[in-house]
């Protein structure tokens, strides 16, 4: 039987879902312009690097922390990790991009569901206390829908893989079939990544590969571009 609650969360994983993810490459465009990423093989290497070295240690750990804070009704912990998500994101374009995507996701979630936690989260932003982040909103939505933390993380990883692959299809460019082959290969990597996220300590939060951040920063100086970040 189909689990409709999981499907409701998976709706937010659609690469065409209007959060603005299609406008952000998170530094990939810099690698493409340098021809470091130029085909399916080199894109997969970059995608592994992004998922393993940046997303895992920022969004991934934060989602686990937020989920348990929701269970324990710990608002201070949510505000703390949300602030850390924002300040540890040093590249300006990716920091602003995450804020914009988080704001759009929260507004869409509130249009579709009556979640007290997401409404509280949105109110914190309206009161100028925080910036909104998609990883926090996605976790709150999954919790509201009764989805387990393991599945929430899996879906979020898939959403990032899918949207970045569609962006690579446009930018490198790759064929649509090649893009689907990338997603198929990366799906096998999701479970391993989630296990790693669940095993990490909170002190590991914020670790990332300097090369990724440098290329995200250097994207600010790219004059001919497809993406905002």
Swiss-Prot record:
Say if the entry is tagged with keyword Acyltransferase: no
Q: One cellular component GO annotation, for this chain's record?
A: cytoplasm
What keywords does the record list, in alphabetical order?
A: Chaperone, Cytoplasm, Nickel insertion
* Location in or out of the cell: Cytoplasm
The protein's predominant localisation is: cytoplasm
InterPro entries (UniProt xref) = UreF, UreF_sf
What GO terms are given for molecular function?
A: nickel cation binding
Protein origin, superkingdom: Bacteria
PANTHER family under this entry?
UREASE ACCESSORY PROTEIN F
Q: How does it assemble?
A: UreD, UreF and UreG form a complex that acts as a GTP-hydrolysis-dependent molecular chaperone, activating the urease apoprotein by helping to assemble the nickel containing metallocenter of UreC. The UreE protein probably delivers the nickel.
The record describes the protein's role as: Required for maturation of urease via the functional incorporation of the urease nickel metallocenter.
Tell me the protein family, please: Belongs to the UreF family.
Protein name as annotated = Urease accessory protein UreF
Q: Which organism is it from?
A: Staphylococcus epidermidis (strain ATCC 35984 / DSM 28319 / BCRC 17069 / CCUG 31568 / BM 3577 / RP62A)
């Amino acid at each position: 039987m189909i689990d409709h609650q999981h499907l409701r969360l998976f709706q937010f994983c659609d690469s065409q879902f209007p959060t603005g993810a299609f406008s952000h490459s998170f530094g990939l465009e810099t690698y493409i312009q340098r021809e470091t990423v130029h085909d399916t093989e080199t894109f997969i290497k970059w995608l592994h690097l992004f998922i393993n070295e940046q997303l895992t240690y920022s969004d991934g750990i934060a989602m686990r922390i937020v989920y348990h804070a929701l269970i324990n009704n710990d608002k201070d912990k949510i505000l703390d990790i949300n602030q850390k998500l924002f300040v540890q994101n040093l590249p300006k374009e990716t920091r602003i991009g995450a804020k914009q995507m988080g704001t759009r996701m929260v507004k869409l979630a509130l249009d579709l569901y009556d979640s007290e936690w997401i409404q509280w989260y949105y109110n914190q932003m309206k009161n100028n206390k925080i910036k909104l982040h998609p990883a926090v909103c996605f976790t709150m939505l999954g919790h509201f829908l009764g989805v387990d933390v393991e599945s929430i993380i899996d879906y979020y990883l898939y959403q990032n893989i899918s949207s970045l692959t569609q962006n690579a299809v446009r930018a490198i460019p790759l064929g649509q079939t090649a893009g689907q082959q990338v997603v198929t290969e990366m799906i096998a990597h999701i479970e391993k990544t989630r296990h790693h996220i669940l095993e990490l300590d909170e002190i590991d939060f914020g670790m990332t590969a300097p090369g990724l951040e440098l290329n995200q920063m250097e994207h600010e100086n790219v004059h001919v571009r497809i993406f905002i970040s």
